[in-house]
Amino acid sequence: MKKLLLLLGLVALSECLYKVPLVKKKSLRQNLIENGLLKDFLAKHNVNPASKYFPTEAATELADQPLVNYMDMEYFGTIGIGTPPQEFTVIFDTGSSNLWVPSVYCSSPACSNHNRFNPQKSSTFQSTSQTLSIAYGTGSMTGVLGYDTVQVAGIADTNQIFGLSQTEPGSFLYYSPFDGILGLAYPNIASSGATPVFDNMWNQGLVSQDLFSVYLSSNDQSGSVVIFGGIDSSYYTGNLNWVPLSSEGYWQITVDSITMNGQAIACSGSCQAIVDTGTSLLSGPNNAIANIQKSIGASQNANGQMVVSCSSIQSLPDIVFTINGIQYPLPASAYILQNQQDCTSGFQGMDIPTPSGELWILGDVFIRQYFAVFDRGNNRVGLAPVA
């Protein structure tokens, strides 16, 4: 009888999936547009997605998270920090590795408009003397590091290091729909040697598998989810195709080719790509993206966005990413984003340091089409068409 109970317990653990619901909200860009601030923002800040992966600040600082690159994010989840837990809305970001939230020590307008962590109201908080700096645009966010219990989908992640911001210059953050960032990349790109949240979960035996997975819903305000410690096959069709990482740090893989109408439009002879839930669009080298924008008839509007005629979506071709020998087509309905105002291209150019070659960022535009599994135990990414 005892053996049976033990077996049942092990089965229950193996099937336990910890799910964080993600809510779709207006992006920071949309909020800036509605408040008439986008033009001023773009004049003051160079929005270059590559700065997230090639920071110019010292490696010891938390400079791998320039905040301007989150301005198009729409998917957010809730976590709790402290005892009792204080609630925060965060971006679950596979393109960075640190956790940070605003603190009560920050009195700038951007902080006062968001949830702020109060260490004095947590019985489990431990302070440190370590500082952090988060670079973005023309200024930086500064703060300190501390330890506390982080609640994620019912998991109590104890003794978790995280950042508490003390200054947040820049009025644009006032309009951001999120409080902070929860990074899900590898520990070797974390600032100050901090252990990322998922690594801490695994090290403490809080999840049964050394992986997590992401489903992003295309249409609904709800339905999107991050799953810790397992895979839910109801979110995808067919089989998962596994892609080995070409580099461990970011979730970086090799793309064989990118084609349209059977012709190569970029990435001839293979290229590198990062699968990043913390990037909303699909980013690539400026020249390649310019060719794609021209091919789909996109032109720039007053808000700096590339727009196409909504009536042309049905006639636009698929753009096909071939990865590890498998084709992943993106239909126009995926790479053209329809909102109340217009139809915008889901592609974005970026400046990349020359030694890095051709790099692409497979953001939410791609992940909405393909359920993604981030397998730390085997250093690979699994992809399958969403159900």
Curated annotation (Swiss-Prot):
Residues 75-384 form the Peptidase A1 domain. It is found in: Secreted. One of its GO terms (biological process) is proteolysis. GO terms for cellular component: extracellular region. The modification Phosphoserine is found at S129. It catalyses: Preferential cleavage: hydrophobic, preferably aromatic, residues in P1 and P1' positions. Cleaves 1-Phe-|-Val-2, 4-Gln-|-His-5, 13-Glu-|-Ala-14, 14-Ala-|-Leu-15, 15-Leu-|-Tyr-16, 16-Tyr-|-Leu-17, 23-Gly-|-Phe-24, 24-Phe-|-Phe-25 and 25-Phe-|-Tyr-26 bonds in the B chain of insulin. The active site is at D93, D276. One of its GO terms (molecular function) is aspartic-type endopeptidase activity. Disulfide bonds join C106-C111, C267-C271, C310-C343. Residues 1-16 form the signal peptide. Shows particularly broad specificity; although bonds involving phenylalanine and leucine are preferred, many others are also cleaved to some extent. This is Pepsin A. It comes from Suncus murinus.
